[in-house]
């Protein structure tokens, strides 16, 4: 059964010490969150849920976040967080509605960027 939420965000991050505070912060800001630790789990979540956005770490222990980014529907905003900006630069050029936030990142900046991208989405569909 899919999680039905107006503001459902996928977080793909294999490091629990990064994932846990990110999920809590997103929930505090009114988002429902589904998580994945591997690229395969992330791909399953993309297929299974109606997402408003995805936050994806490119470097995972098992698989590449890149697979999740390119498999996410183009209308869904994706925030990539990475410690290696050159990795995500190509994805930002190739996939619409993709932004990079470099590690270490601010949770406040991440949520502000997410809200901005969602606002842009609503304006496109108005």
Question: Could you tell me what each predicted segment is?
Answer:
Residues 10, 35-53:
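Acidic, metal-coordinating helix/loop segments flanking the phosphotransfer/catalytic sites
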Residues 16, 37-41, 108:
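Acidic phosphotransfer microenvironment of two-component signaling modules
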Residues 16-34:
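Two-component/phosphorelay signaling modules centered on CheY-like receiver
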Residues 23, 101, 105-125:
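C-terminal output helix
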Residues 57-72, 85:
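Conserved phosphotransfer microenvironments
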Residues 65, 93-101:
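As written
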Residues 81-82:
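Hydrophobic/aromatic residues positioned on beta-strands within the core alpha/beta folds
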């Amino acid at each position: 059964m899919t999680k039905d939420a107006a503001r459902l965000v996928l977080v793909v991050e294999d490091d629990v010490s990064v994932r846990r505070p990110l999920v809590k912060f997103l929930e505090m800001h009114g988002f429902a969150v589904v998580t994945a630790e591997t690229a395969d789990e992330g791909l399953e979540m993309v297929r299974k849920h109606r997402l408003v956005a995805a936050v994806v770490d490119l470097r995972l222990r098992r698989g590449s976040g890149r697979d999740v980014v390119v498999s996410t529907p183009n209308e869904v905003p994706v925030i990539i967080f990475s410690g290696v900006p050159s990795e995500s630069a190509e994805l930002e050029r190739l996939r619409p509605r993709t932004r990079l936030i470099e590690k270490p990142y601010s949770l406040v900046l991440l949520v502000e960027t997410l809200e901005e991208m969602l606002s842009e989405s609503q304006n496109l569909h108005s």
